[in-house]
Regions:
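C-terminal hydrophobic helical "lid"/dimerization subdomain
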Residues: 8, 109-161
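Helix-to-beta-strand junctions that scaffold the AdoMet/dcAdoMet cofactor pocket
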Residues: 70-72
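Short glycine-rich anion-binding loops that position phosphate/pyrophosphate groups of nucleotides
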Residues: 59-60, 82-84, 159
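Glycine-centered, small-residue-biased loops immediately flanking beta-strands
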Residues: 74-75, 99
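Hydrophobic residues within alpha-helices
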Residues: 2-5
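Rossmann-fold NAD(P)-binding glycine/threonine-rich loop
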Residues: 80-98, 109-117
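Adenosine-nucleotide cofactor-binding segment
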Residues: 7-65
Length: 161
């Protein structure tokens, strides 16, 4: 949703992915550019180029790889909450370039309503995979394996009443 929202707001959107196979999907969502974060050359091409990075990864990872991409006074905001902590970032990289790491949760009711209104106005919808109630265990296993493209939504009509 972040890619779709930023694109609709007119931002130049650069998406990061760990695999080449997701490049086309990110472009289809509205990304102007896609960087494979495991490709050192692609990452190096963006050093000191971003004012803001929205980091949605919910697994521990090296934050330094992304904070080095921030311009002076840039901010990376974390919205993914990993089960175990991220490795500690390199402090001098933050201090000397006045870079910041921030966190954010979902907004309150007014912010959520504003976002929903914006989505309705711009025809933005969530990409989901609809599953039946009897597929919940399979969906869980797929999630554990990382074999998930979009959020699962359970079709409530398939649940035993």
């Amino acid at each position: 949703m972040g890619i779709k929202l930023a694109h609709a707001m007119g931002a130049h959107v650069v998406a990061f992915t760990t695999t080449e196979s997701k490049r086309n999907a990110a472009r289809a969502l509205g990304a102007d550019d896609v960087v494979v974060s495991r490709n050192d050359d692609e990452m190096a091409a963006h050093v000191k180029s971003f004012d803001f990075i929205l980091n949605t990864v919910a697994a521990p990872h090296n934050l330094d790889a992304f904070t080095t991409l921030l311009k002076r006074d840039g901010t990376m905001t974390l919205v993914g909450a990993p089960a175990t902590p991220h490795p500690s970032p390199e402090v001098f990289n933050l201090i000397f370039r006045r870079r910041s790491i921030a966190g954010s949760m979902i907004g309150g009711i007014p912010e959520t309503q504003e976002m929903l209104d914006f989505c309705a106005e711009h025809g933005i919808v969530a990409d989901i995979e609809l599953i039946r109630g009897d597929e919940i265990n399979e969906a869980w296993e797929r999630m554990v394996k990382g074999d998930v493209k979009y959020r699962f939504v359970i079709d409530s009509a398939t649940l035993a009443g």
